[in-house]
């Protein structure tokens, strides 16, 4: 492995150690660059008594093993109260309102780059914090700092970090953002880190391995209703609108229908007033397509954002190909976005993130769809 010349001797970095391979290698790379590195493990959720979910204890054990191997200190902090107030209650409120939220984005905004940064600053006297996210930062000659997509396009996590401020990006380091995932695992294996072959965590932390419907049903009462076609024909029942999102194909419980073709059924709309789930056949059903959207709760990394009328690209969901679009400001808090070509399954309540090439500009929340 190529050795890295130490260049940052004395600067203190607190690395968010999750017990996974990305944060493990982040800590190692920063040590190689000459930083004074310490780890901080966050506990963000109080598990059930049987500790079946989230595996926080196992993650802490792995984080400690990595820190011991690297010879660095590991601190722990409990942000469960902050997580409940700022992330989980938002998650429930959005589902209750019939929207589909993204708690990972809110967690990054309120916990990993706010509560964590404040703790690292005030208690641990940090110069920087670091996370195992696949994004990059670029420091420009004019003193500004930009957030860029990660080198590994398949792992790029800029979509989840669009709410970061310019100041937060400037205080954060993202070592693995410069690497492909396979390189990260190779480094971890070469260094003998216990996490080198640990499976990536997926899903929402507080749900763990449980079925989503089972978990959500313990906090929000389900309201069963009808499943209808756009023409109003009742073809089934649902257990609750909150369990379904636009574009969903699996889990609808609709078999072969008389007089219908063989195309699969998709959720194309929700009628909240009537508690009806509307489905149509084919992934490009007209009710599933949007020509644009209005976006509110805007946040720009550089505070100013793109100019009115500009032509850039947008992601309306994670892992989606960028979509070319044109932006028009309705006011300083709201955008009208028109796509070059219609887009399927644009979902109110979800985040959209705007890009200028490799630069993540910021984003907002989908409010209403523009159709026809």
Swiss-Prot record:
Gene3D superfamilies: Adenine nucleotide alpha hydrolases-like domains, HUPs, Translation factors. ATP binds at residues 16-23, 42, 132. InterPro entries: MnmA-like (IPR004506), MnmA-like_C (IPR046885), MnmA-like_central (IPR046884), MnmA-like_central_sf (IPR023382), Rossmann-like_a/b/a_fold (IPR014729). GO terms for biological process: tRNA wobble position uridine thiolation. It is found in: Cytoplasm. Its EC number is 2.8.1.13. One of its GO terms (molecular function) is tRNA-uridine 2-sulfurtransferase activity. Disulfide bonds join 107-205. The active site is at residues 107, 205. Residues 102-104 are annotated as: Interaction with target base in tRNA. Residues 155-157, 317-318 are annotated as: Interaction with tRNA. The keyword Magnesium does not apply. Pfam families: tRNA_Me_trans (PF03054), tRNA_Me_trans_C (PF20258), tRNA_Me_trans_M (PF20259). One of its GO terms (cellular component) is cytoplasm. This is tRNA-specific 2-thiouridylase MnmA. It comes from Shewanella sp. (strain W3-18-1). The gene is mnmA.
